[in-house]
């Protein structure tokens, strides 16, 4: 399966979710590769650090490619069971070329007005991609949300996202938890940490498509 984490807004947790899903799949003994298509190289650096510090943990093969990466993705999909793509947070050649070959798009969004304003153009981009890739499933993932259950922004964002025909709302809501930052610094996934709430969030996200 080819799973793309991408969107039109930076700083929404795409690399965090891409690396965490990669670890989740590695724990299931899946043969995976992580494709870092973001020039900030967050996923690539995370993978390198993991190999250097924790050689006994399941390792995540990572390659870095930029530009039109459709052919690279198709080649990797023949050699690996799953390809996880981390694309930059903007309308880019990497994002568009990934969308025409991906099976699944997860687009993380903060429950903020500035993030939600980007959804209309993303919705149109998905529609264009589906003209060439009818199998593409697209999910909006509410990410970095307040862990305070009394905050109403999640309900408001969910209501707003109902207006977009090309995007389904993922069941998972990923909260703004320190453990995600700790896991990134330690080159781990949260399922290798001790926070059960974060583990459940990644499990819920993974079970959206597995």
Give the role of each language-model region:
Residues 110, 137-152, 172-183:
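G-domain G4 guanine-recognition motif of GTPases
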Residues 184-199:
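C-terminal boundary of histidine-terminating zinc-finger modules
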Residues 94-113:
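Inter-motif core of Ras-like GTPase G domains
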Residues 157-188:
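Beta-strand-loop-alpha "switch" segments that mediate conformational coupling across diverse proteins
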Residues 16-17:
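Hydrophobic positions on the alpha1 helix immediately C-terminal to the Walker A/P-loop
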Residues 2, 6-8, 12, 23-93, ...:
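P-loop/Walker-type NTP enzyme "switch/lid" segment
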Residues 117-135:
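Conserved C-terminal guanine-recognition region of P-loop GTPase G domains, centered on the G4
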